[in-house]
């Protein structure tokens, strides 16, 4: 029992380290609990700061599920204990003791925990998320669909009924955290993820300097994902007025120099009438 409690505590405490809040504070981004969807998770950070920060938070959140589960497996814990350790990590992410119990929705942490628990299950859940997000462009719908299927994937691939309850509890918690998204989906008010390419292409794209764009009610969205050709055209448009001014100045300077260099007239002065007389 002491071993079980130890792993549960480790999972919960690691899950309580909210990477979304830490990343936003480190890089000077708005507090994800107060801006955007007010959810301290990867999707909201992507909205607030761009793709590079969203992916960073997603990776850290996944590690919070991966590390405690790997630790439990290294300590030769039973599969059901490992599954409860994964549950503890997800609960820690949702209700972190270090951040006044205001956490995220646990999707990335759940996928990370499943990857460490059973790699194929984790891959299937992640693939489900990517496919749903790619076709319907709703992050919440992708999360609901993929996590809901996780317990049934485990039954098919593992066949151990003992691990079904903790995985099913994770599903219930994730669905509860998405209750507002579920209502907005029904009403047709849920914001879509908006990318220039498919979701898979955006995630696989190597350049970290390109920001993602997402629609959100009441928020102005600036598209920073501009092609290089467009950037070049904008730069040239800015430089053209400066070039014209420089040319005008050069012409004025040249005309002054030419005027200064012209020899003075050497024509003799005409004598007055009196001198002639």
UniProtKB/Swiss-Prot annotation:
Annotated Pfam families: G3P_acyltransf
Comp. bias (Basic residues): 240-253, 262-271
EC number of this enzyme: 2.3.1.275
Broad class of enzyme this protein falls into: transferase
Main location: membrane
Catalytic activity annotation: an acyl phosphate + sn-glycerol 3-phosphate = a 1-acyl-sn-glycero-3-phosphate + phosphate
GO MF term list: acyl-phosphate glycerol-3-phosphate acyltransferase activity
Transmembrane regions listed in the UniProt entry: 3-23, 55-75, 79-99, 111-131, 155-175
Domain of life: Bacteria
Cell location: Cell inner membrane
Its biological purpose: Catalyzes the transfer of an acyl group from acyl-phosphate (acyl-PO(4)) to glycerol-3-phosphate (G3P) to form lysophosphatidic acid (LPA). This enzyme utilizes acyl-phosphate as fatty acyl donor, but not acyl-CoA or acyl-ACP.
NCBIfam families the record matches: glycerol-3-phosphate 1-O-acyltransferase PlsY (TIGR00023)
Assembly and interaction partners: Probably interacts with PlsX.
Name of the protein: Glycerol-3-phosphate acyltransferase
Taxonomic lineage: Bacteria, Pseudomonadati, Pseudomonadota, Gammaproteobacteria, Legionellales
């Amino acid at each position: 029992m002491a071993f079980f409690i130890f792993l549960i505590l480790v999972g919960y405490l690691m899950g309580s380290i909210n990477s979304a809040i830490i990343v936003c504070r480190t890089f000077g981004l708005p507090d994800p609990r107060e801006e955007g969807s007010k959810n301290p998770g990867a999707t909201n950070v992507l909205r607030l700061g761009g793709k590079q920060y969203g992916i960073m938070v997603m990776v850290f959140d996944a590690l919070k599920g991966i590390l405690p589960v790997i630790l439990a497996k290294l300590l030769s814990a039973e599969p059901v204990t490992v599954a409860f350790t994964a549950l503890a990590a997800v609960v820690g992410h949702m209700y972190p003791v270090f951040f006044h119990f205001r956490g995220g929705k646990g999707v990335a942490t759940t996928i990370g925990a499943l990857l460490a628990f059973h790699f194929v299950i984790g891959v299937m859940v992640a693939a489900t998320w990517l496919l749903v997000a790619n076709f319907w462009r709703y992050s919440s719908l992708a999360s609901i669909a993929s996590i809901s299927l996780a317990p049934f994937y485990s039954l098919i691939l593992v066949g151990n009924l003992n691990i079904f309850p903790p995985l099913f509890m994770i599903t219930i918690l994730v669905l509860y955290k998405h209750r507002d998204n579920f209502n907005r989906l029904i009403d047709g008010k849920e914001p879509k993820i908006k990318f220039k390419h498919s979701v898979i292409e955006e995630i696989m794209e190597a350049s970290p300097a390109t920001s993602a764009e997402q629609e959100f009610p009441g928020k102005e969205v600036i598209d920073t994902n501009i092609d290089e050709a467009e950037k070049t055209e904008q730069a040239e448009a800015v430089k053209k007025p400066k070039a014209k001014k420089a040319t005008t100045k050069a012409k004025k300077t040249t005309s002054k120099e030419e005027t200064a260099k012209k020899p003075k007239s050497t024509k003799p002065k005409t004598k007055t009438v009196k001198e002639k007389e």
